[in-house]
């Protein structure tokens, strides 16, 4: 094993001198992988890697980046930040570098005479734009809810990184219907702590179970806050300082000045797309609930103030479809998901009642007599007789057969004399070896 360099030894000594909270803060700030924290030496070597130093410097503001060139005249706050990031060590006798001076060569090109750009607040969004932004956010909430419902009701294998397999994606598209970007929704739900894994399959987390009891505005706040917690520190600091700043050249100029090692053009482009998907910004202007997020205020309340009104229910038609004329409240979506099949997702969905959907409801514990009542609760018009007849017919046929398990044997009790004969003569059931043990009873 090669001996560590003098620089590595000095950094190891410094690491050993700081306390545990400081060490934990350093590891988090410099984004050190757990695998590199097995010893002070492995940690020091990772802190001294050129890539880690380069990425860490990118996140430091101008004032901190200028401090290493003249530490004696730097602000105490900047020196503390550099020491917390393991770039400088401060002692009563002065300051010393914890990394090679050559690793900080990018700082020599900084212009310490550059002028800070003027901040001009963005214009207020119109009522229509606020409503459109809220609709975008609510669409995301509904789509994530639909994804969680699908994962709760079926098994979807995942790959090594917790991503859905190609087969799972295909199954989810078939389950959810048109209008969903499964990959994007999966990432958002995972980032929010709603999706995890159980072995080789996707699974809901404890937080996902709590999600079901939240209002749509509280759900939105959770998604927005989770996303914002993962954005680069330079963006978080900029918007916290100026919550009303537009995401156009104004933001780019401010980032370029305050974080001179960041390339804002490429970085902000992808972040802007995410922010638009979440309804954080509308036409590059921050929404009121985005500003509430950056000011530490009530995001859910600000979002609810601009959210579109819920439709009173759905319109049922003779062809077994149920159409919404606007966003549906969570309780209406829950009822419809329990007894119908969703044909079109999104903010204004379309459902269809089928024999399979009614049978699934009965198997999930919905009583036969409650199906018509549930339909009346969510429909704004009279429930067509065809829907009631379908529910009654499926319930009647489902109740024609009872299955009971007794140790190693299974008993089938039929309520129609002819059903017993049908089951015995069914070629697909020959493998069960059904035997008649009574007028309406079979055993296998």
PLM features: residue spans?
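Short, amphipathic alpha-helical interface elements at domain boundaries
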Residues: 1-261
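Extended alpha-helical interface modules used as scaffolds for assembling large macromolecular complexes
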Residues: 224-444
